[in-house]
Design a protein with these regions (language model features):
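Proline-centered linker/hinge motifs at extracellular inter-domain junctions
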Residues: 70, 114-121
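Short edge beta-strand segments in beta-sheet-rich domains
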Residues: 2, 101-105, 114, 137
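Acidic, turn/loop-rich segments in luminal/extracellular domains of secretory-pathway
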Residues: 33-110, 133, 171-208
Length: 208
């Protein structure tokens, strides 16, 4: 993710050899409503600041061009939810031989996009086994995380498929509608905490 531009400068003192430097003027963030501000962490501020760079002025002239570039990894902006914005303002300062300065501000506007939540689980937590006549229940859990810090994911469940085999392990066994409904109804999940962007969901399979 990048953008770039340039500014030009000139000094009427023909023997001056101006130099360019940069400084961060301000960095602010707003929620998607466009008016509610929120704080950025030190790491986020560092990433947003370090993304701005300028070229070096050629030293043998009293006038010239300074190119600026803003380049940041998409992963460094994952904390922004859809339509949240960051406004980063930087100063490019031209300084001559007599320490006289001229300043040009560069404003970079960044708009967030929605990032999908990520699910993680070990194999023993996403597979269950029960045997008729003994244990008739099993359980496990999965974890989830959403990089959009103000997102509040919810969880739902549905049945992808139900299949049955005879004792030989290969011959399909037809289930009645009631049997299939009972098998599906035995699966349930917990409700995740709605006050966080990450957490865990417990699942249970229990059949009579």
């Amino acid at each position: 993710l990048s953008d770039s531009g340039s500014i030009t400068f000139s000094d009427v003192d023909l023997t001056n050899r101006p130099e360019a430097s940069k400084a961060t003027h301000s960095i602010s963030a707003l929620r998607s409503d466009g008016s509610t501000s929120f704080d950025l962490t030190q790491d986020q501020l560092a990433d947003l600041t370090n993304a701005f760079s300028i070229s070096t002025v050629a030293g043998a002239t009293n006038s010239g061009t300074v190119n600026w570039d803003y380049s940041i990894l998409e992963s460094q902006l994952d904390f922004l939810a859809a339509n949240e914005t960051v406004t980063a303002v930087f100063n490019i300062v031209i300084t001559d031989n007599d320490e006289q300065t001229a300043t040009q501000q560069v404003t970079v506007n960044i708009t967030g996009a929605n990032d999908a939540p990520v699910i993680s689980a070990s194999n023993d937590n996403i597979a269950g086994s029960i045997t008729e006549g003994s244990s008739l229940s099993d359980s496990g859990s999965i974890s989830f995380a959403d990089s959009d810090l103000d997102d509040r994911p919810t969880a739902t469940e549905d049945t992808k498929s139900v299949s049955a085999l005879r004792a030989d392990g290969t011959t399909p066994l037809a289930l009645t509608s009631a049997q299939q409904q009972a098998i599906e109804a035995a699966f349930s999940i917990s409700t995740p905490n709605t006050n966080t962007n990450d957490g865990s969901i417990n699942w249970t399979y229990s059949i009579d």
